[in-house]
From Swiss-Prot:
Protein localization: Cell membrane
InterPro entries given in the database record: RibonucZ/Hydroxyglut_hydro, RNase_J, RNase_J_2, RNase_J_C
Bilayer topology: Multi-pass membrane protein
GO terms assigned for molecular function: metal ion binding; RNA binding
Pfam family, one: RNase_J_C
Name of the molecule in the record: Uncharacterized protein MG423 homolog
Originating organism: Mycoplasma pneumoniae (strain ATCC 29342 / M129 / Subtype 1)
Primary localization class, coarse: membrane
Transmembrane residue ranges: 29-49, 80-100
Amino acid sequence: MAKINFFAFGGQDERGKNCFVLEINNDVFIFNVGSLTPTTAVLGVKKIIPDFSWIQENQARIKGIFIGNPVTENIGSLEFLFHTVGFFPIYTSTIGAVVIKTKIHENKLNIPHDELEIHELKPLETVKIGHHNITPFKVSSSIPSSFGFALHTDDGYIVYVDDFIVLNDKNIAFENQLNQIIPQVANKTLLLITGVGLVGRNTGFTTPKHKSLEQLNRIIASAKGRVFAACYDSNAYSVMTLAQIARMQNRPFVIYSHSFVHLFNAIVRQKLFNNTHLNTISIEEINNSTNAIVVLTAPPDKLYAKLFKIGTNEDERVRYRKTDSFIFMIPRIAGYEELEAQILDDVARNEVSYYNLGREILSINASDEDMKFLVTSLKPKYIIPTSGLYRDFINFTMVMKQAGVEQSQVLIPFNGEVLAINHKQIDNKKRELKLNPKCVDSAGLQEIGASIMFERDQMSEAGVVTIIIYYDSKKSEFLNEITYSFLGVSLDSNNQVKLKTKMEELIRKQINDIKDFTTIKRRLGKDTSKELKVSIKRAVMNLFTKMTAKAPLILSTIISI
């Protein structure tokens, strides 16, 4: 009989940072090591990554990392895992291996070849890893040759799928092998772990609403000049559709992303796309072309930065022309609405025709009927929805009821909560891991906490005020000089002068209150210094709130000389 634990380091009640752990007896399998790109409200934070402490403590039991759909949300933290913990065998598809190796090369990680162990699995070929047999199978997702995994245990199968749609097209790049794996595991599936996708947000099947060929072909056929199309690098389906149209309309084709060029070349090498008669040009030739289809693609944070640079004529390779057309193919994401509007404003300011297809074309994720098909075919005893917000999980549960699934069968753990299944039954004993996710900024890895994120939010909304006070440790006295800086604080010059005058009065009062104490002690002690800085911060914050109704971040510093 099997003892099974499932828990998440990320991906539960959030979209991104997917990292899930499956313990089967003494074997540990990790699915995804992703990252989360926060909205612009979190100033200076490039990405948020999982806490790897548990992995470090249990690394001897870890049999491998499984990557079915190699997108940023699933592989964005691999480099940090390598640096902080070490290397583990990675099991993925041939395409997944290319994406992972490209990321490693991009990040300039000096990893010896004998330490980086990537196993390219063949679909429907069972392999024994640790003490368990695992069968990968192809699913139709946004990246060609994406995998799901079926793990065999003494109590039945555990089926893991990131994203999928039910698709019966003859496109081998997005082949669907659900019909082959279902007979093997149907009625024997103990647990289905699946991404929540569009379940609860889109009734029916996702197909054919994910297809963009007809709309794109019509737009591009009427375009007078070059066509720029922006999409995430996880959307290989759309990039390949654009390449197909370039071939059909005899237009030059270029992908403005060195990393995605590697992926596209791998897709061609694997004979997943026929590039015969496709006129590809280099990135350097974009401005020389008059009618090229230019794909602008990158992970979310980098893509928006790239689009901003192009829109403001700061990009070194691309300049918009009045004859150009721009197609925005990015799905709307909460927190990015302002960015989207600004990018489209920049495009319009350059007198470029634009089309926003982000709301018209569905992402390649399971909708209600896709998920109902999978669940009714597998008949799992338990289901764990992943990679979504809590409301998504509630909607998922309601849709599953329509498929005849009892509410008690749908298990919704949050990050760190351990779900235990012993001898085919849920163990109701509560257990939780304490997690401390990390954020990555320009200085590297940082601890993350509510206070840190609040301060970054303050900086983005109202700016920063720095105050520097100087203390002569030899004479045990404060100098008269006080240095102020207003960074990102929107105030006119008159108000700044008034504020500085009031601030100086407040600060000198704070200093005078402790002068006698420091004279007696003959030095500025650590506790006194901290007390003074906190007191100044509080007083200046109150002053700002009263005079300006703003609440910038106040940073007070005492320098001993």
